[in-house]
Regions:
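Extracytoplasmic ligand/sensor domains, especially the bilobed periplasmic-binding protein
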Residues: 110-225, 275-297
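Bacterial N-terminal signal peptides that target proteins for export
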Residues: 1-12
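C-terminal motif of bacterial Sec signal peptides marking the signal peptidase cleavage site
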Residues: 19-22
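Segments of small-molecule ligand-sensing domains
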Residues: 321-334, 345-403
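Beta-alpha junction/loop-to-helix N-cap segments that form part of ligand/metal-binding clefts
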Residues: 26-31, 52-56, 71-155, 228-235, ...
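Extracytoplasmic "Venus flytrap"
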Residues: 32-62, 68, 72, 82-94, ...
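Extracellular/periplasmic periplasmic-binding protein-like sensory domains
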Residues: 264-338, 351-352, 401-410
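Solvent-exposed loop/turn segments at secondary-structure junctions
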Residues: 46-49, 84-88, 118-123, 141-146, ...
């Protein structure tokens, strides 16, 4: 699939064309009442394990820019894609994430920041963009502590907002909503007792906390709540401990990784009866197919994206335009990146004559109500969270992940 724009010598995309307009920084000056050219940045890992989906997300952002018509009132808008990864590391790095956020903050024309992909990366970039009063919207960071109490670390969410003002939101449901969907899915599968392990990352720990709180409300007993170092090669001892608890199911809260695959395999070998559950982080055909067939067939995962036939018409139209423009189907996260971009552009438009004012654009974002979009109709609450609450409960077949249940979380 077509590649995105690199962080080094980052290239600028104008709204008027789906092409690189040239390399270099955004304009440094604007009229006295504010810049007439605005820059929207994205920060995504374009190399390594997340490279393919990040490239699709960048392409979705580019498509939203192309469709926006060239200008928003008297304002021109440009796009700069920043790479939060390196070819050597093969994933996002703290240094790159921080450098990207600083790049945006130093640009007086910057109006919004789309990213990061992972919650742990967003936890690094957000305090910087917040100090710069730049609206930041993540297409995929779900950690509760970014927006509300309930995370796994102290002083959250306050530590992410040194300016004292809220400047962050997301177009994907937060982990407390996802946890409710997961527990609901477990209940439909007859689960009464679940063993729960997480990785030691921000996302995994936070999701595990939410799952441990949600399960008893649905009559499901959490038998184990521990964490594991996914860098280990052998999880047989830990898996044996899980099996001794005699659960109906096993849930791993954490990012997709070779270590996560080894955990599922070890638990499945220790107890061949168990159903295996996973979050949206592992709701990926490539990850599930990396598991032995006997293990994959016991996997149950949830994802915020329903199959195309159940998506809004606007989502199906986006899919067709993406395929026609870039020569292949988009990953599910591309739809979220597209909507994040459209939401930024519409927030600039809603700010009217103050569309070049960061605070006014942020206020317009938080005023989002009953918005019809490719993701469905939603509102943004005072925390910056979306009201979207529908998930796909998927199971593995020979053809890949297929829909098993549509899960709707009560508001």
């Amino acid at each position: 699939m077509a590649g995105g724009l690199r962080a080094v010598g980052a290239c600028v995309l104008t709204v008027a064309a789906l092409a690189v307009a040239g390399c270099g920084g955004a304009d440094d000056a604007g009229p006295q009442d504010g810049p007439s050219t605005l820059t929207i940045y994205s920060s995504l890992p374009l190399h390594g394990v997340d490279g393919e989906r990040s490239h699709d997300m960048v392409n979705a952002i580019k498509l939203a820019f192309q469709e926006s018509g060239g200008k928003i009132g008297p304002l021109s808008v440009t796009y700069v894609s920043l790479d939060s990864s390196t070819p050597k590391d093969g994933t996002w790095t703290s240094d790159r994430v921080l450098d990207n956020a600083r790049t945006a903050v130093r640009d007086l024309n910057a109006i919004a920041y789309i990213g990061d992909l992972d919650s742990a990366a967003t936890a690094l970039s957000l305090p910087l963009t917040n100090e710069g009063h730049i609206l930041q919207i993540s297409p995929s960071s779900t950690y509760d502590g970014l927006t509300r109490p309930g995370g796994s670390r102290p002083a959250e969410p306050e530590r992410f907002y040194p300016s004292g003002q809220r400047t962050f939101g997301r177009v994907v449901a937060a982990d407390h909503v996802q946890a409710a969907a997961l527990v609901g899915y477990m209940k439909t599968q007859g689960v009464r007792r679940v063993a729960l392990l997480s990785d030691r990352d921000l996302y995994g720990g936070g999701l595990a906390e939410q799952l441990a709180a949600a399960a008893p409300r649905e009559g499901i007993q959490v038998l184990d709540r521990g964490d594991v170092d996914v860098r280990k090669r052998d999880f047989s001892d830990r898996a044996a401990d899980v099996a001794k608890l005699d659960p109906d199911a096993f849930m791993f809260a954490g990012e997709a990784s070779p270590g996560a695959a080894r955990i599922y395999e070890a638990v499945a070998e220790a107890d061949p009866r168990l159903l295996l559950f996973g979050s949206d982080a592992v709701a990926d055909d490539a990850f599930v197919r990396s598991l032995p067939v006997a293990v994959a067939r016991r996997m149950r995962v949830i994802a915020p994206a329903l199959p195309p036939r159940l998506q809004p018409r606007a989502a199906r139209e986006f899919d067709a335009r993406f395929r026609a423009t870039f020569g292949g189907p988009p990953v599910p996260e591309a739809l979220q990146a597209y909507e994040a971009t459209r939401l930024v552009l519409d927030s600039i438009r809603a700010a009217g004559g103050r569309g070049n004012d960061r605070a006014a654009v942020t206020d317009a974002f938080f005023a989002t109500r009953d918005r019809r979009s490719v993701l469905g109709t939603y509102s943004i609450d005072r925390f910056g969270d979306t009201s979207l609450n529908t998930f796909a409960g998927d199971r593995m077949t020979r053809s890949g992940l297929v829909l098993d249940k549509v899960l709707r979380v009560k508001p």
